[in-house]
Amino acid sequence: MHLRQFLYLTFFLFIPSLLAAQPCREVSAYFPSWKWYNRGQLVNPASIHYEKYTTIIYAFFKPNPDGSISPFDPVADKTLLLGEAAPGIPRAYLGKKDFGNPDWHNDRNSLVKRAHSEGVKVVISVGGWTLSDQFSSIAASAEKRRRFAHSCNEMVRVYGIDGIDIDWEYPGFITNKGSADDKYNFTHLLQAVRDSLDALEFQRGRHLSLSAAFGVAPTRMAEIEWAKVVHLLDHINLMTYDFYGNSFATTNHNAPLYSPEKGLNGYDTHSAVRHLMERYGVPSWKINIGLAFYGRSLKTKGAAGLHVSSRQLPDTKTFPEDGGTPMFRPPT
C-alpha cells in the first residue's frame, strides 16, 4: 500500500485503542503528522481534547538503511513536537532531516508540552506500512540494532517524549523485504531498544515505555516470539482493523468485533484477542485493541450488499473525499 492509500485506510486523525480488560486503563490515539496539513491545520496540539486520552502516539518516524532513525516530515515533526520555530533560525533548518534543536523553538504550543500539562504521555512511533522495508535488515545486524536503539534514546532526549512505539509491518512479510529470520531478529531488536531505554531511565529517573503494533491475522501472530517479546513491552497494540477490504473478492466487514457470518477463521477482534491470550499467554492488561474510525466502500459486480462479489475497487463516487473510504468526522 502506498503512502497516499495508507493515509486513507489506516490512521485517521485519532484512532483510539482501548484495553481489552475492564475497566479500561489505557486510551491511546495516533497523531499522524501529515493530517496536520488538512483543513487549515484543524487538528493541532491546541485542538486536542487531552482529557480523553492517556497517551498520544505520534506517527511516523523513518528507519534508515544504516539503522538510524530520521523524521519523515522534518517540517511537521519539528514544529509539532518542539513547537513553533523561533525567528531568525537558518532558512534550511526546518527541512533538514535531523531531530532538531529545542533551543530554536518556542515549546509553548508543542504537542509534548501541551500533552504533559494535561497529564498525557507522548510516544513516537517508528515505521508504519510504507516505512517498514528497512526493519528486516536492521533487526538482522547487531550494529544496526545498536544504532537504532541509540536513535530511540536521542528522540527521547530531544523531544522529551515518554517512550517509543515500533510499527513493523510485518516481521516475515516478503513484500516489505522480510525474511524467515525476522521472528527471532525482532526479539533482538526490541531487546536492544528496551536495554537502551532502561539505561536512559536510570539517568532520568522515570519510566520510558516501549510498545509495538502487531498484525492480528493468525499467520502474522505466528511470526512473533511472544513468550520473549511480552516481557519487553509495556503495551501490545493490535491492528484490529483492515481485516477485509478491496484485496478480497467478496465484500465483508472492515473491523468486525466478532466473526462475520462468512469469512476467514480468526479474522475478527474477539478471536484475535482470545488467540493472543490463550495460545500465546499474553496478559490481557497489556493488550490494546485498535478501533477504526472509518469504514470501507467497494464497488460490487451486482447489487450492493454484504458477502457479495466485489470488483475490488473503492466507491470514490459516493465517497470522493478520502479515496472511497467513509470516515467519522466529529462536528467542528
Indicate residue ranges for each PLM-predicted region.
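Bacterial Sec-dependent N-terminal signal peptides
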Residues: 1-22
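Glycan-recognition patch characteristic of GH18 chitinases/ENGases
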Residues: 22-156
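Short, well-ordered coil/turn segments that N-cap beta-strands
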Residues: 24-25, 52-54, 118-122, 160-162, ...
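Mobile, glycine-rich extracellular loop/lid and propeptide segments
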Residues: 123-128, 159-171
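Extracytoplasmic/periplasmic, Sec-exported soluble proteins
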Residues: 48, 99-107, 140-148, 158, ...
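Substrate-binding surface in catalytic domains of secreted glycosidases
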Residues: 28, 32, 38, 71-89, ...
